């Protein structure tokens, strides 16, 4: 395997980890909100399923969680490659966190203000916008932290090899 392919695979792997961690953080956040507010998180998962597969079976709660995590992993990989391209050689931590948070805020805006009102209006009304935005920002914070940890490990390895 060439060095370039190895680096691309490494970026994809960290994207998978960041996306999965961010997606799980969102599930945890919505679960906590549901426990406090009395909103059924099962309905949230079912509506995720209905957004993608409107005629899904009774196992739509688990399907909704699977769909959510699959989309989260895809988003994590996409953001990992965006960071790799846009911040190549730029070591400022605020730039990395800012780019990830800006990207996730944009994703939230497109989803909740453009796509979901058309695709599944019921889903948009399940939770307050502030809760869903906080969920996406939490995803961004978790993902950015993972990207930063990975970058710091690479810097340490490079310094170690240079010595």
Q: Model segments located where?
A:
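N-terminal signal-anchor transmembrane alpha helix
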Residues: 6-37
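Internal alpha-helical transmembrane segments of multi-pass membrane proteins
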Residues: 13-15, 84-106
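Aromatic-anchored segments of alpha-helical transmembrane domains
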Residues: 23-24, 102-113
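Membrane-interface interhelical connector segments
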Residues: 36-57
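Interfacial helix-start motif at the membrane-water boundary
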Residues: 51-71
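Hydrophobic cores of alpha-helical transmembrane segments in multi-pass inner/ER membrane proteins
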Residues: 73-77, 135-149
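Transmembrane alpha-helical segments of integral membrane proteins
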Residues: 81, 108-121
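Non-cytosolic membrane-interface motifs at loop->transmembrane helix junctions
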Residues: 121-134
């Amino acid at each position: 395997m060439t060095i370039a392919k190895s680096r691309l695979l490494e970026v994809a792997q960290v994207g998978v980890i960041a996306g999965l961690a961010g997606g799980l953080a969102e599930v945890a956040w919505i679960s906590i909100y549901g426990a406090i507010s009395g909103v059924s998180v099962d309905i949230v998962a079912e509506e995720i399923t209905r957004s993608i597969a409107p005629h899904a079976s009774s196992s739509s709660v688990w399907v909704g969680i699977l769909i959510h995590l699959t989309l989260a992993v895809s988003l994590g990989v996409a953001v990992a490659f965006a960071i790799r391209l846009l911040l190549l050689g730029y070591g400022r931590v605020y730039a990395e966190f800012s780019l990830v948070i800006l990207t996730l805020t944009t994703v939230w805006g497109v989803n909740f203000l453009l796509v979901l009102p058309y695709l599944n209006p019921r889903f948009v009304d399940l939770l307050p916008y502030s809760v869903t935005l906080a969920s996406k920002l939490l995803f961004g914070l978790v993902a950015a932290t993972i990207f930063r940890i990975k970058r710091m490990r690479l810097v340490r390895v490079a310094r170690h090899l240079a010595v």
